[in-house]
Design a protein with these regions (language model features):
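Alpha/propeptide regions of enzymes that mature by internal proteolysis
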Residues: 1-305
Length: 305
């Protein structure tokens, strides 16, 4: 199989928004064409998606439920053992680049203030304002939360609550819950690649998934959950992170591939693992295949030399 790259824009992004994924894939493919390795290709692709502004990553990241907090996660991994991740990172436009630089350290994961200081020391600290889309999405989420506050006050929590009542119950932002409500007025991007030398790599990045508590970290920076790469291929996941974590989904798919399951079948089997109604999407690449699978159509691209 020729050098190949696959990108996606998250389960919330319909195919009509795939142009950003195509641009990202082209940039990554250029790296592969220049004989740079798969890791450089996927980082380049994801950095493009982070800079786009439409996707829930980088400058397009969704605000926390207090209306001002931006906590970003990202990770990279390749089949030669390089691994780096960041979680709850603030004031950085390209967390995927910070994750890549962590592969040069003895560590694999930095979080919060430590991750931000690391970004500052390597010249990647770059504060930014929430995008227009992020501000609009925040208003939409707050409207939903306010409805839960008005309609469910005093009612017992239910499984159908979708987390809104529980988020209010355990609210832990410095701003009060009511102040956030009064201010009212899912997605991860990713790339997987195979280079001409047969090496695989994956990169993922997200701005989080409201409604969520301050400090929430889900699948994106957790190895084997939102991403995995090894000698047999690379996998990236997107969707409701807690469900992905509970199934260690990326590593689970990778194990199926090792056992001989074709890539497309493995991706579709992963989707079937999660309950109906749970948004989920995956991309993957092996020595012979490159595929996208999702519960509902999502923005993505596949390019090869």
């Amino acid at each position: 199989m020729a050098a190949t790259i696959v990108t996606h824009g998250g389960t919330d992004m319909p195919p009509e928004e795939k142009d950003g994924c195509e641009t990202a894939a082209r940039l990554g493919l250029q790296k592969l064409g220049d004989r740079q390795d798969a890791l450089e290709a996927v980082v380049t692709a994801v950095a493009s998606l982070e800079a786009d502004g439409r996707y829930d990553a980088g400058v397009g990241s969704l605000m926390g439920m207090d209306g001002k907090t931006l906590e970003l996660d990202a990770a990279v991994m390749d089949s030669r053992g390089r691994l780096g991740a960041v979680a709850a990172l603030q004031n950085v436009r390209h967390p995927v680049k910070v994750a890549q630089r962590i592969t040069d350290t003895p560590h694999v994961l930095l979080v919060g203030q430590g991750a931000e200081e690391f970004a500052r020391r390597i010249g990647l600290h770059s504060p930014f304002e929430p995008s227009v889309k992020a501000q609009r999405k925040f208003r939409e989420y707050i409207a939903e939360m306010k409805k839960a506050h008005d309609d469910d006050e005093g009612a017992e929590d239910t499984e159908e609550d979708d987390g809104k009542t529980l988020v209010r119950k355990f609210w832990n932002f410095p701003t009060s819950w009511q102040a956030a409500v009064d201010r009212a007025g899912h997605g991860t991007v990713g790339a997987v690649a195979r280079d001409e030398a047969g090496h695989f790599a994956v990169a993922v990045s997200t701005g989080g998934s409201p409604p969520a508590l301050y400090g929430r970290v889900a699948d994106t920076p957790l190895i084997g959950c939102g991403f995995y790469a090894g000698q047999h291929g690379a996998i990236a996941c997107t969707g409701i992170g807690e469900h992905i974590v509970r199934n260690m989904l990326a590593r689970t798919v990778y194990e199926w591939i090792i056992s001989g399951t074709p890539l497309q079948a493995a991706l579709e089997r992963a989707i079937a693992l999660l309950p109906q109604g749970i948004d989920i999407g995956l991309i993957g690449v092996t020595a012979t295949e490159a595929h996208v699978a999702a519960r509902k159509p999502m923005a993505s691209a596949i390019l090869a030399l």
